[in-house]
């Protein structure tokens, strides 16, 4: 089954290949919808070291992500946006193929990745798509060559189905933003929409949203699009849109001002820098896996998660750290496991005595 929308609507979406601390959809969807785009976003859950948009949204009390095709379409038409999980009648084969890929060592097959991403987007009725293709220690694409091959396949396959695809190659060598973990990332997204963005998430959210505004002719240039995006945050339209989506999907809108509803844990354990030096490498994958010990993520699809747990992590590649300087904190409900996670996160940072260049957030857009 596929969903169709009236031809005059500018139906667009974004897909990320998955990373650590990647809460971009939570800002992009309300911003884009507040600027006149129609966003029928079908998202996934977290698995392994990567987080999932649905889990982040479900940290909002009452927020529903499962709808019939009819309900989903109605929500999108009424609010310009809905964020939901796959339903049984939409791309039913994808879940079966995914389970097979898992046990046949073909999770990284470019053809199967393309089929999985695009089948959802074609089925949900999108006509314009920006793909955030992550490269680095927290991505499943370790290098640019493999990423390029996948990008070409996504663009050419999309074209055959009337889907205009742009691909951004982005940096996943440092966790994105500050928060990693569901409720904590939701808080960070709300703060962004209140006009308090962090540098890396601002660059990424603005650029990806701008690509959609230009692709749909709502903006003539990326510069004009970015000005529109900044205005939507400044005048509160984007935050209002998020609140509208929360209410429409059964969530408690009080989370916008009461963060305790999103994340309250028994313990907040400090993470101190194990040595002095410049951050030369961050094993983002190891950080993602470490947080599974406190139930911030899951190893199997059936695992349940604790939406309140996670970590706040300050350092990025190139930053200088003093020994014992606070570099973040672990939010957990089990102190012993939390202390284990602190140690694992400390190990994920490699420090060098030589200065390290800051890395770009976006390598290229094709």
Protein language model regions, located:
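Active-site cofactor/substrate anionic-group-binding motifs, chiefly glycine-
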Residues: 1-43, 47
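Well-ordered secondary-structure scaffolds
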Residues: 4, 106-108, 113, 123, ...
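Phosphate/diphosphate-binding glycine-rich loops and adjacent basic-rich segments that engage nucleotide
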Residues: 77-126
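Glycine-rich tight-turn/loop motif centered on a GG-T
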Residues: 56-66, 100-107, 140-144
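Short acidic, glycine/serine/threonine-rich loops at helix termini
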Residues: 25, 43, 50-55, 86-88, ...
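Short beta-strand segments
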Residues: 42, 76, 84-86, 117, ...
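Alpha-helix C-terminal capping segments
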Residues: 26-40, 120-125, 160-161, 215
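A glycine-rich helix N-cap at a beta->alpha junction
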Residues: 56-82, 152-158, 162
């Amino acid at each position: 089954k596929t969903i169709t929308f009236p031809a005059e609507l500018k139906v667009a979406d974004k897909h990320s290949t998955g990373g650590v601390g990647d809460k971009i959809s939570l800002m992009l969807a309300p911003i884009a919808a507040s600027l006149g785009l129609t966003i029928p976003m079908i998202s996934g859950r977290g698995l392994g070291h990567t987080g999932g948009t649905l889990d982040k949204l479900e940290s909002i009390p009452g927020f529903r992500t499962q709808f019939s095709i009819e309900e989903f379409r109605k929500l999108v038409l009424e609010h310009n946006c809905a964020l939901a999980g796959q339903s049984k009648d939409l791309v039913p084969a994808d879940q079966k193929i995914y389970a097979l890929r898992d046990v046949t060592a073909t999770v990284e097959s470019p053809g199967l990745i393309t089929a999985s991403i695009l089948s959802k987007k074609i089925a949900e009725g999108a006509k314009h798509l920006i793909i955030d293709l992550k490269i680095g220690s927290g991505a499943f694409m370790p290098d640019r060559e493999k990423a390029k091959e996948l990008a070409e396949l996504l663009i050419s396959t999309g074209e055959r189905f009337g889907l205009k695809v742009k691909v951004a190659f982005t940096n996943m060598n440092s966790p994105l933003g500050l928060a990693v973990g569901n409720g904590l990332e939701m808080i960070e997204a709300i703060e962004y929409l209140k006009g308090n963005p962090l540098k890396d998430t601002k660059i990424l959210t603005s650029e990806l949203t701008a690509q959609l505004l230009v692709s749909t002719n709502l903006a003539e240039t990326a510069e004009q699009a970015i000005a529109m995006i900044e205005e939507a945050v400044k005048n509160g339209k984007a935050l209002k849109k998020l609140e509208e989506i929360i209410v429409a999907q059964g969530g408690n809108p009080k989370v916008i001002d009461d963060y305790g509803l999103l994340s309250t844990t028994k313990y907040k354990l400090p993470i101190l820098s194990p040595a002095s030096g410049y951050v030369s490498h961050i094993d983002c994958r190891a950080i993602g896996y470490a947080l599974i010990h406190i139930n911030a993520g899951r190893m199997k699809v059936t695992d349940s998660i604790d939406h309140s747990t996670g970590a706040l992590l300050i350092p990025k590649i190139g930053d200088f750290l003093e020994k014992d300087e606070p570099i973040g904190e672990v939010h957990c409900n089990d102190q012993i496991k939390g202390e284990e996670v602190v140690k694992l996160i400390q190990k994920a940072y490699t420090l060098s005595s030589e200065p390290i260049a800051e890395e770009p957030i976006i390598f290229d857009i094709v």
